[in-house]
Structures are given as C-alpha cells and as structure tokens.
C-alpha cells in the first residue's frame, strides 16, 4: 500500500527553530535512530515510528554509521523506508549521519582521519539509498589526528556534494572553538554541535559549549534528553529486567544510586504536579533553553513517540518550577 503523509503535518503540531545563524530550521523534537531501529528490531515497527514522526512534523532524522545493532543496520532500515515510502518526500527531510566511532576492523575503521570519514560516508550513502546527506558529523574528537585534517575532510565532503552541511558531536569547548574557526575559513561553517544534555547532565551549561554555540552562530541539538531512560517512570521502583541497565552497556547499575533514585522520584512528583510525565518535563526543560535548537529523542514504540511529542502542547516551565528543579538537584 502506497504511503501518503498527513496533509496537516506542518500545522501547529510542530514548531521549528533556526539552527544557529543558518537558513535551516529544525523541529523542536527530532528523531534519533541510535536504538530500536537496527537489524534486531522488527522492520514494520521501525517503519511505523518513522512515518508517524513525519506525519507529525518531525523532519529531522539522525543516524550514524554504527547505529544498530548490528553496525550499519539502522541506516539500512532507514534506507529501505526511504526507498519504499519516503523517497517522494526527500526534499522535506533533513537527514544526518556521523563517523568517528568504531565501525570496521583495522586502523581506518574509526576516529577522524580523512580516509575514514570519506569511506564511512560513502558506505552510509549506499546503505541509505541516498546521493547526499543533509548533515555529516565528525562523531567524536580525535586527539591523534590533526584537527585541520578532520575539518578539511568535512569541508571537502560538502564541496564534493556528499553533504550539504557539517557538524561536530561531543567536542570539548576548546576544540570546538578551533573547529568553528577552521570550518569558517574553509567557507563551510559548522551548522550544529550535538551534545549530551539533560536535567541530570547539565555540563553544556557550565563548560562553555552552549554559550560557544550561540557566540559562533552554531546550532545545538541535545541527545540523551531522558538520560537513557532515567528521566522517566522506568526506574522509580528499581531496575526492570528488560531495562538498559539490566542489559548492560552504556548505563551501569552503579549509576542508579540511592541519591539518584531520590532525585528522580522528587522530579517525578514535580512532573505529576504539573500534570505531565517526567519524560515530558525533561524535554520541556531542555526546550526552555533558547540555545537548544532541537531535542533528539529515541522511540521504542509509536505510543512512546506520541507521548513525548505531546510535550509540545504543554505549558513551558515557570521560573519557579525551574528553580524547584535546581533545588532538587542540589538539596538531596
């Protein structure tokens, strides 16, 4: 059956923010395919989530070469959806991918060399059935490769027509400042920085990253807005057997201390008092920062996506509520 997107996908369902000083607008909520879209996940479920997102005004889909599992399979899933459903709407989509983390064996399978970045993007384009991506990121800073080499590769990728814009991900403030300067001199200014930012991890506010983005006219997109599920009702009563902490990986059991549980429970009560879920309040908190261009969410189901998108219909946090959140973080 042929897919036809919702006719009112650009109604008041979604608001869009300017990305730095560029001509690009990003949806306040974007969809990331880090988890739940790999080869181990049912294809029909992945397709349903992506099409629901587009039907509701999400135009930005964020990937990376090694998203899955297995590596590359999230791009393959997305490429299949592009080919079968979304190809007629390619010009309405803003697609990003990244390279820099472990992807293939040998000395050229990761980090920031020119060889790795070009090879990885060529592979990504093939997996996604695309001629170009809208944003290509250096996924992490490589301290062993000259920054000039990495930035020149990004610039040349744009000049080769393989990407329209470039971005950097998880770069420390001082290195990001140098990267912005090189890219500007190359006449391919940095469009966006992607960084971890949420109520429990406020470092971009304090380490200069957010203010640096604003000063340099660079957008900022926040990943891990729910702190890998900690900022939800998932861990209020312990560690569920099917949770990310129970499965291992990035989140460790020692992350969930008694203090952390107390903070999460207090935040959850504040969210209840506001008439929303903790996840919705966490997204709302991020959108309250004018330097945040977009919040990058994941989705394990259409229902979860629907609930998180409903945040856009919620009133913003008041100054008093923001202070209550800070009090919770510092008083427990």
Where are these regions (language model features)?
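Acidic-and-aromatic substrate-binding clefts and catalytic sites of carbohydrate-active enzymes
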Residues: 38-43, 66-74, 142-146, 173-174, ...
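N-terminal binding-site loop/beta-alpha segment at the start of enzyme catalytic domains
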Residues: 1-93
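N-terminal small/glycine-rich loop or linker at the start of catalytic domains
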Residues: 20-38, 96-109, 132, 137
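Active-site groove signature of glycoside hydrolases
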Residues: 126-145
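Short, acidic/polar
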Residues: 41-53, 112-127, 176-180
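Conserved beta-strand positions
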Residues: 31, 63, 97, 135-138, ...
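Short, well-ordered coil/turn segments that N-cap beta-strands
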Residues: 25-29, 57-59, 87-93, 130-134, ...
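Beta/alpha (TIM)-barrel catalytic core signal, keyed to glycine-rich beta->alpha loops juxtaposed to Asp/Glu
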Residues: 2-13, 145-332
């Amino acid at each position: 059956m042929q897919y036809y997107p919702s006719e009112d996908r650009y109604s008041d369902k979604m608001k869009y923010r300017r990305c730095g000083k560029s001509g690009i607008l990003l949806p306040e909520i974007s969809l990331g395919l880090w988890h739940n879209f790999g080869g181990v996940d049912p294809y029909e479920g992945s397709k349903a989530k992506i099409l629901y997102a587009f039907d509701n005004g999400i135009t930005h889909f964020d990937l990376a070469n090694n998203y899955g599992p297995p590596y590359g399979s999230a791009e393959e899933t997305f490429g299949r959806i592009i080919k079968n459903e979304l190809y007629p709407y390619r010009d309405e989509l803003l697609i990003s991918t990244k390279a820099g983390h472990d992807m293939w064996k040998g000395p050229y399978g990761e980090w920031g060399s020119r060889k790795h970045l070009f090879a990885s993007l060529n592979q990504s384009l093939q997996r996604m059935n695309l001629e170009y991506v809208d944003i290509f990121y250096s996924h992490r800073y490589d301290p062993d490769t000259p920054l000039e080499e990495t930035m020149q590769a990004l610039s040349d990728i744009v000049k080769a027509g393989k990407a329209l814009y470039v971005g950097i991900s998880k770069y420390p403030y001082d290195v990001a400042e140098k990267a912005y300067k090189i890219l500007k001199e190359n006449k391919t200014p940095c469009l966006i920085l992607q960084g971890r930012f949420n109520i429990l991890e406020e470092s971009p506010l304090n380490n200069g990253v957010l203010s640096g983005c604003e000063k340099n006219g660079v957008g900022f997109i926040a990943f891990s807005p729910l702190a890998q599920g900690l900022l939800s009702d998932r861990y209020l009563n312990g560690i569920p057997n099917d949770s990310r902490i129970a499965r291992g990986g990035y989140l460790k059991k020692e992350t969930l201390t008694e203090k952390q549980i107390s903070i999460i429970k207090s935040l959850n009560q504040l969210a209840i008092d506001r008439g929303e879920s903790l996840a919705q309040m966490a997204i709302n908190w991020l959108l309250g920062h004018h330097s945040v261009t977009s919040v990058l969410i994941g989705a394990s189901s259409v229902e979860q996506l629907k609930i998180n998108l409903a945040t856009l219909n919620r009133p913003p946090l008041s100054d008093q509520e923001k202070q209550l959140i800070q009090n919770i973080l510092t008083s427990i």
